Amino acid sequence: MAEIEGKVAVITGGASGIGEATVRLFVTEGAKVIIADMQIERGASLAAELGKAAVFCPVEVRQEDQVKAAIDMAVTRWGRLDCMFNNAGFGGALGPIEGVPVEEFDMTFDVLVKGVFLGMKHAIPVMKKQGTGSIINTGSISAITAGRGPLVYSAAKAAVLHLSTVTALSVADCSIRVNAICPGYIATPLSSNTVGKPDKLIEEQLEGKSFPQPIPRVGRPHDIAEMALFLASDRSTFVTGQNFVVDGGAASGVFWEQQNPIYKKYRPIRVYNPDKG
């Protein structure tokens, strides 16, 4: 039996990158999915490719009526909402704090934080009525380690993590789970400044490049989709209020000797053997 057979999900930012990978995986694993995205052509094309299991709904996550419409569409078509994946995002305001325009700061928080808030606001009443549900919010390792992303983006993602945790506590007695996923560097249009290009092309551009993390390969959207699948499935019914870091070990730091090439000549490191001294 498929992992999430018969479940219904709404995935914001579902037309590309992590969202697209998750849509594809969820459909493969038996779910029905609303692809909620502002990329109309790409979202509609993906839905057409996947057939009856996926429906596209144009959504700009700052607009409350559009977020609600996507959730209503899921309930109208399939009678329920098992998973709300608040994943839509963008890089946000750039530059030093003193140079960030207020309107760009506001837009960054509107998309990254308000978008998550609106998704949870309208998903929770449906889930309370049916007595179960899983909410997944996309954070970032920049929310837990400084210097991993633009400063306003990092602050907004930190807000997403705390909003996820406090919301999880408030709805746990309703059997609604709320968790966050913190991706590291993932080969997506957002991270590689290649919006509109196929994900395969993005991976090819990044192939062979090294990354400052214990697992040196670039992360792939499917890596995050697999974690989302776990959180949407019945395997995680006792998991809530948690932040799952999927980053190749980046947030854990870099092994000291990797940063100090001069010491590589001393490898392999001698392991103490109590029998030989």
Across the structure, where does each feature detected by a protein language model lie?
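Conserved mid-core segment of classical short-chain dehydrogenase/reductases
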Residues: 68, 91-106, 129, 149-152, ...
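Alpha-helical segment proximal to the catalytic Tyr-Lys
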Residues: 125, 169-173, 237
